[in-house]
């Protein structure tokens, strides 16, 4: 059995100031209790529209797994792995065009984050820029790390948002990441758009023995100090 419910809304009374929010809850139950999933994900956006662009602040929080893998997952179950969002184009799936994305995960379940952006900045006709900075972390119990690091990459799917998911990363409450991204779009013709996306992601994994130990993310890194980074420059049409 599975159930989802959500509510979304916005306040534009003080236009050009806008407040928007989104709250979702989902659960999925199976005969085997270890496969059960139940959780929620919420986000909040504050933005102010100006003539040259729209600055904004936002944040999100998704429930994470507790320290007991036998009672199922406390992350919200999802049907599609393509969980698009408007906050992150690199760490999560947020790019509407062909791009490299989802470096941390296909959606934001099991994570929290705060961010700031300058959206649709434009000084030339049909050319827009969006700059974003996100700081995020996991909401999963550190103890759950051993159930990932002590198994193969494929087996680690059992502690992600649903059994057949292969998210690249599994963040605990002791893990953090910083994302900086710049998206540029040029509408050359009505039906032809050129997009240049540049992003950088720094990741800090807790390499203490209580979390990832000396081998953070089995089959992801061999040794190291728990600090990793990735970058991407992507051109699409």
Where in this protein do the model-derived segments appear?
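A compositional/structural signature marking long, glycine- and acidic/polar-rich segments
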Residues: 1-45
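Membrane-embedded beta-strands of outer-membrane beta-barrel proteins
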Residues: 5-7, 42-44, 116, 182, ...
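Transmembrane beta-strands of outer-membrane beta-barrel proteins
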Residues: 10, 20-24, 56-60, 130-134, ...
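Repeated loop/turn-to-beta-strand initiation elements of outer-membrane beta-barrel proteins
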Residues: 15-19, 52-56, 124-129, 186, ...
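C-terminal beta-signal and adjacent terminal beta-strands/loops
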Residues: 190-220
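Outer-membrane beta-barrel "beta-signal"
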Residues: 227-237
